[in-house]
Amino acid sequence: MSVPSFITAPEFEGGPPQGLSIPFRLRWSKTHPPKEPIVTFKGRTVLVTGANTGLGFEAAVKYAAFGADKIILAVRSIEKGEEAKKRIVERTGRDATDISVLKLDLGEYSSVKDFVSALHEVTPTLDVALLNAGLGNPTYEKSSAGWEMAVQVNVLSTALLAMLLLPLLRSSAAASGAKSHLTFVNSFAHTLVPRDFPLIEGSILKTATDESSWNASSSYNIVKLLAMASVQGFARMEAGEDQQRVIVNSVCPDLCETDLGRKFTGFISSIGKAIFYYLFALSAEEGARCLIGATALGPESHGRFWHHDFLYPFGELAQDQALMKKTWNEIIEAVGRDEPEILQLCRTT
C-alpha cells in the first residue's frame, strides 16, 4: 500500500459529546486520543518551533520517522536543541546531517529576524512550518516591546515569523508543485471566551495585554482567541493570492503533558499538575499525532481548525468575521510599530 503525502480532512461529526463540563470533556479526550496519521513527508523540508521538548519534540521525531528530507529545530537554547537532535537520531536512526538546530526566542522581534536569516543559510526550501512554540504564565510579565509576554510570544512574534516565512513557503510550493503548509498550534480554549466577555474598547488585543484585568485563566483563553484572529488573517491573505500555494490552518492537540506551564512552580503547583495530568492529559506523543496530521491536510483545511481528527467549528467569537478582521489589523499594526517591514509585506503579499 502506498503512503499518501496528504490526507483528506473529514468535516466535524464527532468529538466530545455536547454539554460536557470541562473536566469531563478533558477526560473524554484522554480516553479518545488522536489517531496516528498514515502519511509520508518524503521530499519535504520541515520546520518545528519549540522543538526541543514536549509536543514540538515529539512532532519532530515523527517528521524524521515519516521521511522528511530535512528537519529544522527552532529552539531557545542551542544546547538543548542539540540534545533534542541527538535523541531524535537515536529514536529514528536518521542521519544527524538531516537535522539542523537554530536559535529562536519569540520574546524578541530581533531574534525572529535573526532566525529567518539563519534559516535561509541552511535551506533553500521550506515545505512545512509548524509554529508550535508557546508560553503560559502564572503572573503578568511584559516583553521588551511592552506587551504582555504571552501575547508577545504566542501572537505578535509568531505573526512576524509567519509573515517572514511565507515567501519561502510559496517559492518552495512553486518549485515542487505541491502546496506548502503553515500550521499554527492553537487551542480549544479560544471557544471558552463568552460572547459577552468585556473587551476593553472592543479590542481583544488591548484586553489581552491589560495588566489591571489580567488573570492567568481567562487571559490564556483570550490569547488563544487573539491568536486565532491571526491565523484567519493569514488564511485570508493567502487565499487572495493569484495562485494560492500555502495551506494555512490551526490545530489543537488538547491538554497534553508538556512543560508549557513550566513557570507554575512550587510544591503545591507541582503536585497539582501531576494529579491533573494523570487524570486528564494526553501524552506529548499522542498530541503530536494531531499536529502532524494538520500539516498533511489538503486544501479543504485552509483557514480551518483541526481538532479531534476533524475540521472543528470555531468558537462563537472566532466566527465573528468583523471582530476577527478588526483584530487582525490591530495585530499587524502592533507588530508594525516596531517592525515596519511587516506592513510592507502585508501590502506586497
From Swiss-Prot:
Induction: Expressed exclusively during fungal penetration of host leaves, the time point at which plant defense reactions are triggered. SUPFAM superfamilies: NAD(P)-binding Rossmann-fold domains (SSF51735). Transmembrane segments: none annotated. Its EC number is 1.1.1.-. The keyword NADP applies. Short-chain dehydrogenase/reductase; part of the gene cluster that mediates the biosynthesis of a tyrosine-derived cytochalasan acting as a fungal signal recognized by resistant rice plants and leads to avirulence in Pi33 resistant rice cultivars. The first step in the pathway is catalyzed by the hybrid PKS-NRPS ACE1, assisted by the enoyl reductase RAP1, that are responsible for fusion of the tyrosine precursor and the polyketide backbone. This is Short-chain dehydrogenase/reductase OXR1. It comes from Pyricularia oryzae (strain 70-15 / ATCC MYA-4617 / FGSC 8958) (Rice blast fungus).
